[in-house]
């Protein structure tokens, strides 16, 4: 099973998205899926929302929850549905990298304590 299909199973289509959107969603979220490869898929939840789809003021969001990390949300106000999803995805990927790096630094770069004499 490909990385994309594993993580597509973790996607919740919320307000404004439909099953018909799945092919373009899978293609649009490839950077996110690549970034998520370091995590167990069962620890990942992805929510997609679009408000006022196809109208001025459209609001697209991608929300990613990875167990043990803070929830990250990317938002776009671009008018094109595909471009907005990719814009929101790029924002989430950037935040996810930062959160994962901070988490890694906190848990793996601790200096051993010096014994007391």
Regions found by a protein language model. Give the residues of each.
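N-terminal, polar/charged subdomain of small-to-medium soluble alpha/beta proteins
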Residues: 1-117
């Amino acid at each position: 099973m490909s990385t994309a299909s594993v993580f597509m199973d973790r996607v919740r289509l919320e307000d404004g998205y439909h099953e018909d959107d799945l092919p373009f969603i899978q293609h649009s979220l490839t950077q996110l899926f690549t970034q998520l490869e370091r995590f167990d898929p069962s620890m990942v939840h992805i929510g997609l929302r679009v408000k006022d789809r196809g109208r001025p003021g459209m609001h697209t969001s991608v929300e990613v929850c990875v167990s043990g990390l803070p929830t990250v949300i990317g938002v776009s106000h671009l008018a094109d549905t595909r471009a907005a999803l990719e814009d929101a995805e790029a924002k989430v990927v950037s935040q996810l990298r930062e959160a994962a790096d901070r988490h890694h630094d906190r848990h793996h770069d601790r200096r051993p304590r010096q014994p007391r004499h």
